[in-house]
């Protein structure tokens, strides 16, 4: 995997002696890839790339976004009109969000149609389904952050859906909104979910997902 010039360097030997870098590199580069693998098996990787773009562009916007009902929309407009390349960063964030959802759906169909969810890969499928739910949650929480008319009413409708559940419905609605009505507490909760809670959850399940794929390998043809 590494050139002879690199492996002969003192720095490489120092790290290899302590961390067995060469053994790790050999394991990565020698992993068997079935001959039936085609471009459709790259959809999961493309979904990951979209997530990384989301993370980078979202992190950049947190420097300027203000999660308050009075300043949220103005801060988004400031990003779009005043911040250098802010319009591009936010546009890429929106485009990659749509692309991530699309790639996730296509990846799910590919895995289902090729039987990649069958024994012994049931847990890999379960972690993928959990990540799909988290991805949709990203979309719901992120859609509200500009706190414009569309975002406000989207939050009001989405957070009101659980109200139809017997007994616990009103409790869930108040838990989501942070109050009996949609307001600052709701925006704060959605912002916290979108920028902190959900990224940690999806990172953990991604790690589990990739470790299981690494251990079990790519599923064979039907």
Swiss-Prot record:
Chain's role: Component of the cytochrome b6-f complex, which mediates electron transfer between photosystem II (PSII) and photosystem I (PSI), cyclic electron flow around PSI, and state transitions.
PANTHER family reported in the protein's UniProt record: CYTOCHROME B
Cofactor(s) the protein needs: heme b; heme c
Cellular localisation: Cellular thylakoid membrane
Cofactor remark: Binds 2 heme b groups non-covalently with two histidine residues as axial ligands. Binds one heme group covalently by a single cysteine link with no axial amino acid ligand. This heme was named heme ci.
Pfam families for this protein: Cytochrome_B
Name the UniProt record assigns to this protein: Cytochrome b6
GO cellular-component term (any): plasma membrane-derived thylakoid membrane
Residues that, per the record, bind heme c: 42
Keyword annotations of the record: Electron transport, Heme, Iron, Membrane, Metal-binding, Photosynthesis, Thylakoid, Transmembrane, Transmembrane helix, Transport
HAMAP family: Cytb6_f_cytb6
Membrane topology classification: Multi-pass membrane protein
Residue intervals passing through the bilayer: 39-59, 97-117, 123-143, 193-213
SUPFAM superfamilies assigned: Transmembrane di-heme cytochromes (SSF81342)
